[in-house]
């Protein structure tokens, strides 16, 4: 992988991690266009995902600071309940990560037809949430946190947008748009860091995780994903507040159909 390819794919990851159009799907499409496969693709995916975690920490630092200040009061306050909800939302993705990790990695190598189909499913979810009758719950309940977590677990499928799935599910459950967007971006931090930790452990054991990717390409990809992620995170929060997800539904539908057509006609 050249540094230029890493730059393009890093920008793609940073933008699509927060926009409800599936970062994994677009990375798969981009990797296919550049001819990047196997361990090289997986290693780069991990690096740019960690970069977007740092984007979230920067953009939502005030919310994170609020959570930790309240958490260390050691009381059952709003901040503690928020952390509990995040932990609850992690249960489904944790189960998938522990018991179905190999299956997920196989799915990522299953080709662009799956990506195209999942992009169509993302479009359907966004459309349903857009036309759903609006309700405004004061806060995200434990039950809603678990259901949103289920949506996140399902979104391990390449092409099925994680942010799109979690935000659409939360909106269908009647949650506040702004609070839901923040929760969606914060709940993904622990799973991504957990995945990164597992791969660090592999490297300590002497397993080759990075493949043949040059260090420069990894660094360029990381910075590109971080900077573009900061921009996209702020933008997406405003988009959710204004309820303009239908435009992304149209985009995902078109992208899905084009991907399927190109795959079948190849």
Swiss-Prot record:
It is found in: Cell inner membrane. It is a multi-pass membrane protein. Keywords: Antibiotic resistance, Cell inner membrane, Cell membrane, Cell shape, Cell wall biogenesis/degradation, Hydrolase, Membrane, Peptidoglycan synthesis, Transmembrane, Transmembrane helix. One of its GO terms (cellular component) is plasma membrane. Pfam families: BacA. Belongs to the UppP family. Its EC number is 3.6.1.27. Bacitracin is thought to be involved in the inhibition of peptidoglycan synthesis by sequestering undecaprenyl diphosphate, thereby reducing the pool of lipid carrier available. This is Undecaprenyl-diphosphatase. It catalyses: di-trans,octa-cis-undecaprenyl diphosphate + H2O = di-trans,octa-cis-undecaprenyl phosphate + phosphate + H(+). It is an enzyme of class 3 (hydrolase). One of its GO terms (biological process) is cell wall organization.
């Amino acid at each position: 992988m050249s540094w230029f390819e890493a730059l393009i794919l890093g920008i793609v990851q940073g933008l699509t991690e927060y926009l409800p159009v599936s970062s994994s799907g677009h990375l798969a499409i981009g990797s296919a266009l550049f001819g990047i496969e196997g361990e090289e693709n997986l290693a780069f995916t991990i690096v740019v995902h960690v970069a977007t975690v740092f984007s979230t920490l920067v953009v939502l630092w005030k919310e994170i600071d609020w959570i930790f200040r309240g958490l260390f009061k050691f009381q059952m306050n709003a901040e503690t309940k928020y952390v509990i909800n995040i932990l609850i939302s992690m249960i489904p993705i944790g189960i998938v990560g522990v018991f179905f990790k190999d299956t997920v990695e196989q799915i990522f190598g299953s080709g662009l037809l799956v990506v195209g189909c999942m992009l169509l499913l993302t479009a359907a979810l966004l459309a349903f949430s857009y036309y759903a009758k609006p309700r405004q719950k004061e806060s995200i309940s434990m039950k809603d946190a678990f259901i949103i977590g289920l949506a996140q677990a399902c979104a391990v499928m390449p092409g099925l947008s994680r942010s799109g799935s979690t935000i659409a599910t939360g909106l269908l459950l009647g949650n506040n748009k702004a609070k839901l967007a923040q929760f969606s971006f914060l709940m993904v931090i622990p799973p991504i860091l957990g995945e990164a930790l597992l791969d660090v452990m592999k490297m300590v054991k002497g397993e080759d995780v990075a493949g043949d990717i040059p260090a420069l390409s990894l660094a360029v990809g990381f910075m590109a994903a971080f900077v573009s992620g900061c921009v996209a995170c702020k933008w997406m929060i405003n988009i959710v507040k204004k309820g303009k997800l239908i435009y992304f539904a149209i985009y995902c539908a078109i992208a899905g159909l084009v991907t399927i057509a190109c795959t079948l006609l190849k």
